[in-house]
Amino acid sequence: MASEIAIAKFKDVADGLQHGQFSIGERENVIGLDGLDSVYKDLLDRPITITLGLIGPDGRVNLTPMWFDYEGDRVLINTAAHRRKCGWIRNNPQLTLLIVNPDNPYHWVQIKCTVEREELEDAPDGDLVTRQLDKIWKKYTGNEPPYGLRDPVIDEKRVLFVCRIDRVATFGKP
């Protein structure tokens, strides 16, 4: 069963200038990401490269463009196990995703989440990680699986971080 998610809807200028623009206008709760207004849900479903924000070892924010996925009320972050961001996520499991409409930078969704668990591709049930990677490969490239960007020099293994959504902010219109 999907969890309730708090949504903060920022006021924007799509309908003209207004008092308090760019501040939070309305708040609501929805059940799962499927409960988002369609103008924001569309951003999640399109092959838009997100910006992932996380805290690096020096305490500064690290921003990484990457692919993402979601299922119900969980965000899925799939990365190679040998990458630095994998260790940073393990050290501080609080993440922020920003999904900006490439056709209108004043239309975006921000998702703050916390890693609940990780799935390892080399674990007995690791085929879940591979299937999810193949799914986003097709979403973002249009190519049939398998995922075609594995590092050929190493035996690259993947990690799937399953994240609970803490809150969502929305802004603008398409």
Q: What label would you give each PLM region?
A:
Residues 1-35, 107-174:
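Charged, gly/pro-rich active-site loop segments
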Residues 22-54:
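Short, conserved active-site entrance elements at the starts or edges of catalytic domains
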Residues 36-38, 63-64, 82-84, 147-149:
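A generic local structural motif
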Residues 43-46, 105, 157:
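A short, polar/charged loop/turn motif at coil->beta-strand junctions and beta-hairpin connectors
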Residues 44-45, 90-91, 154:
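Alpha-helix boundary recognition
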Residues 47-81, 87-89, 97-100, 108-111:
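Short beta-strand segments
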Residues 100-102, 165:
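Short secondary-structure boundary segments
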